Amino acid sequence: MPDTLNLDQANLTRQEAADRSALISTHDYDVHVDVSGAQDLDRVDYPTVTTLSFSCAAPGSSTFLDYLHHSVETVELNGVMLDVHQVVGAARILLPDLQAENTVTVVGTSLYSSSGEGMHRFQDPADGQVYLYTQYEPADARRVFPNFEQPDLKARFTVHLTGPADWVLASNQPESGRRVVEQGEGPDGGSVTVDFSHTPALSTYITTLLAGPYHRVEDTWGGHPESGAPEVRLGLYCRQTMATALDSDTLFTVTKAGLDFFHELFGVPYLWGKYDQAFVPEYNLGAMENPGLVTFTEQYLFESQATQAQFEGRANTIMHEMAHMWFGDLVTMTWWDDLWLKESFADYMGTLAVAEATEHTGSWTTFASRRKAWAYVQDQYPTTHPIFADITDLEAARQNFDGITYAKGASVLKQLAAYVGRDAFISASREYFARHAWGNAELADFLAVLGEASGQDMQAWAEAWLQTSGVPELWLEAQGDTGDLVVRQEGFDPAAGRTVLRPHVLKVGRYEPDAQGVLARVSSAEVEVPGGSTGDRTVVENLPGGTNGGTRLLLVNDEDLTYAKIRLDEESLRAVLAHPVQDSLARATVWAALWSMTRDGLMPSRQFVDAVARLSAQIPDVGVYSQVIDQAVTAVEHFAPAAEREQVRAVLAKALTDALRRIGPGSDRQRSALRSLGRLARGAGEQTADRFVQVLEPLAHQDQTDLPDGLAVDAEARWIGLNALAALGRVDRPTLDAAREDEVTARTTAWHWTAVAALPEPRMRTRAWNAVMAGRLDGQQLSNDHLTALAQGFTASRPDLAAPFTDRFWPELEGIWSSRSNGLASRTIHGLFPATQDAVPGGPAAQESHPVVQSAQSWLDDHPAAPRALRRIIVEELDDLRRALRAQAS
């Protein structure tokens, strides 16, 4: 350990982690956290006592603990009290002169959080009750208790949690004992300490705590004798005021189906003692795979009408987190370079489980439409990176929970299963668990078992797919000399600056109109595209029908087996712009191709919106339908030229209002159309505003008489109307306040904040800007959700209203980053970036002279040493802006 260790440095590097891992081996943690005073909101901290035992390979050496504390009272190492003034910094605690076997005890206090990082505290606006939960990944366990915060230093944890006697107190493992604390601080004067059974070996980032007056429902999964899995107790938690939205029967059905599926698939028992799932407020993520106590955003509890796409999305997240019990929890990556070893696998396995074990059999269609869209966007940024990434420190790790690590990785694993065969892929997974259970692994470890299972050397495949960046592009063309149909491929790795042609196993489909004018598959052919120098041109064999004749669609990547942007030939493009597609996966693939063309400036936004207006009503899959109409809204707001925007908006508005009246009353697609209509309305100019007001005003006033049949005026629908009317200046603050008082919940509170911030009044605009920049409003610290709500309102209406604040944005960036947690700083900067702009005259190249483009680029040029994570946000936002302006100017 270097003599000049900076005890205030929170950004642990990969090299520091490797050095520490080589020096020490962790054994056991005993962690006691006391939240009995949490209901006193003036109290900012809580006490912790942590005892940790570990071995040292080089006695006499030094190491350090990670701890982002409020205070440290004592540090005792091997029976010796250390001078806290000498060994304690803001982020680390020095442990000098180690013995072969060591025990350290730290007594300190930690801070409650309002950012969703560490110990988050939330007060329910409906009943005043206080709720706590923890969120640690990648490195926020150190905000709660001192530890060695890196994934390869696994240990057994024994946890004790003190809190009010009438609260639920929970952790990863089942309760093993409970004792009364004589002088507690709970509302009834009593507190208890709950002891939990010790865990198997696990990493710090997947330990967890839950405390509060949570509503609980229980059930049991019967086990899986073939794999040796015992009966498992199941639990569901939510806030008391969310209990009516907790559809426990559905949630338990999905959970049991997942446990059955993964035990059959992996043959490895779940051995974490219980399987609780908690739905918590103000959550930064979709969910977190804490073994024994998985946490989810309570957005997955539906208080208003929910679509099947929402239920499918929730089921997918449940399965994703469950897959982590094996990929991530049982076997954990050594360092964050290999984050894909858990996230890519969980994304793939989660979608597979939903498709094969639940009623949502079309989950691969939704994956093709939604998840891959995220991947394609992320992979085209200047910040793109390989799936197996170069993560030098924790700050870089936080930024790589992105569409590449999740959705691109999952798509590549789907291609891998096609490449080596599903049986070989699953066999490799089983062997991977057998070899590395309760330990850590790296890319080479998985490639080794995959090579054995498939009988192939997988190194070249891994180099092409896992260790390069960028999106391959595939298209079909007729070979000039022979007339053969060939698959063409282009690929460029922007990170390495070189061409890369990847191997693909894919299908090419031929579609022709049926009697109803719907494009139906008439033939298909499997094609093996080689990687390397011969991968640019591959002949398609055995595709009946040829390349000439009447209307037809030739679709490369039929069945969506691989990861690539698809180019459509001119005849195929004409076909899909005139006819709907019958097959759900093909339909999703076609719409993804059209959206890529729009984003790339190859298809005018007007043409894309026209296609959506004409054809979207014939998309039966609500997940694809909602994605496509949302993309059309984005096309209007960001890609349509200013001179055409209101005309294009009117085309889409008519299509959506027609959908409200003609699509099945009360249907999922009707609700999706309403949501998109609300988004589209917020930026409307005077010439189109009245069209929206006619539909949205009755919603805002809960007047069912003038609404389309089946359109329920629930809380969500009402606030869709109110938020749009606020942005248009067609409702006032007292009306918004009164609506909020009608129904006080966490969600209506956030919607109210957004609506007030959206009011097109200079005073409200300034109030919202100042609050987000200060992180406080009316003397109250903003939580993560409230900060986002204000930022969304600030940017909701016409861009000219936010323009006066643009020049004030850039000087604040470094101060925001240094003074806030990573999560809150990211929300602030993403939320206030001036992303909605009109192109300047002069064509695509002239957009480099756009004032906001110049300001953003100047900031990057002037701040080369700014934190990489901060620079990445600006680089990506700037890339989005450049893309939009170029499309407008094309």
Regions inferred by a protein language model and the residue ranges of each:
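Short, mixed-charge, low-aromatic patches
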Residues: T4, S114-E117, T204-P213, Y270-G273, ...
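General secondary-structure propensity
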Residues: D30-Q39, T332, P734-A739
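Alpha-helical structural motif
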Residues: S25-H27, Y46, E137, L153-A155, ...
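Small/polar loops that bind or transfer phosphate-bearing groups
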Residues: Y67, I318, V756
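Hydrophobic alpha-helical and helix-loop surface patches within well-folded domains
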Residues: M1, D8, F196, H224-P230, ...
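Non-catalytic accessory/interaction domains
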Residues: P2-T4, G163, V168, Y237, ...
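Charged, low-complexity, helix-prone segments enriched in Lys/Glu/Asp/Gln
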Residues: D19-V33, F157, S248, A353, ...
